[in-house]
């Protein structure tokens, strides 16, 4: 079990490094992981991880060739700037309505759907800039509203 937890920690660190889009070689990734305490990491293991997660080399904003994860595999999280795309959250007796920046609703809805029923979300319907979210059994609309506010760190 301990090695499984260590492996999950390695995968999280590896993905976080690739999201920084600043590593141009496998050797740089090895050194960065070693700096984070993963002493048994080597170039061949990094190479296998790059293949496993579908990492590609592409140009970053500075036009440098760097390793990164494909967009679909880089699962969005609420600690990323996604929360900045949420403009307003409100509710009525039936649904929670979330207004987003134009074009962002489907991305935010995907994140909410990934949380699932255990977090109180039965499902979402997303347009271009609006999301309808309905609570799962055992959750009130108000409970879901408060959970979504907390998720996106919005004020009541």
From Swiss-Prot:
Q: How does it assemble?
A: Homohexamer.
Spell out the Pfam families in the cross-references. Answer: Arg_repressor (PF01316), Arg_repressor_C (PF02863)
State the organism's lineage: Bacteria, Pseudomonadati, Pseudomonadota, Gammaproteobacteria, Enterobacterales
Q: Where in the cell is it found?
A: Cytoplasm
| Origin superkingdom | Bacteria
Task: Answer whether the UniProt record assigns the keyword Isomerase to this protein.
Answer: no
User: Which InterPro entries does the record associate with it?
Assistant: Arg_repress, Arg_repress_C, Arg_repress_C_sf, Arg_repress_DNA-bd, WH-like_DNA-bd_sf, WH_DNA-bd_sf
**What keywords tag this UniProt record?**
Amino-acid biosynthesis, Arginine biosynthesis, Cytoplasm, DNA-binding, Repressor, Transcription, Transcription regulation
Question: Molecular function (GO) terms listed?
Answer: arginine binding; cis-regulatory region sequence-specific DNA binding; DNA-binding transcription factor activity
User: Could you name the Gene Ontology cellular component terms for this entry?
Assistant: cytoplasm; transcription regulator complex
- Record's family? Belongs to the ArgR family.
Task: Say which species the protein is native to.
Answer: Salmonella typhimurium (strain LT2 / SGSC1412 / ATCC 700720)
NCBIfam families named among the record's database cross-references: argR_whole (TIGR01529), PRK05066.1 (NF003457)
Mention one GO biological process in which this protein takes part, according to its record.
Answer: regulation of arginine metabolic process
The protein, known as: Arginine repressor
Q: What the protein does?
A: Negatively controls the expression of the four operons of arginine biosynthesis in addition to the carAB operon. Predominantly interacts with A/T residues in ARG boxes.
Pathway, per UniProt?
A: Amino-acid biosynthesis; L-arginine biosynthesis [regulation]
């Amino acid at each position: 079990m301990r090695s499984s937890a260590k492996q999950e920690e390695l995968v999280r660190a590896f993905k976080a490094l690739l999201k920084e889009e600043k590593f141009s070689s496998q050797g740089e990734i090895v050194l960065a992981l070693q700096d984070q305490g993963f002493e048994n990491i080597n170039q061949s293991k990094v190479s296998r991880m790059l293949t496993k997660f579908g990492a590609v080399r592409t140009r970053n904003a500075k036009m440098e060739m760097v390793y990164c994860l494909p967009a679909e595999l880089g699962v969005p999280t609420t600690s990323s700037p996604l929360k900045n795309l949420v403009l307003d959250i409100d509710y009525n007796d039936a649904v929670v309505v979330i207004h987003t920046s134009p074009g962002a609703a489907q991305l935010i809805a995907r994140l909410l759907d990934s949380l699932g029923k255990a977090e109180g979300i039965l499902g979402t319907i997303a347009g271009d800039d609006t999301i309808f979210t309905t609570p799962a059994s055992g959750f009130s609309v108000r409970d879901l509203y408060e959970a979504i506010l907390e998720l996106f760190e919005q004020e009541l």
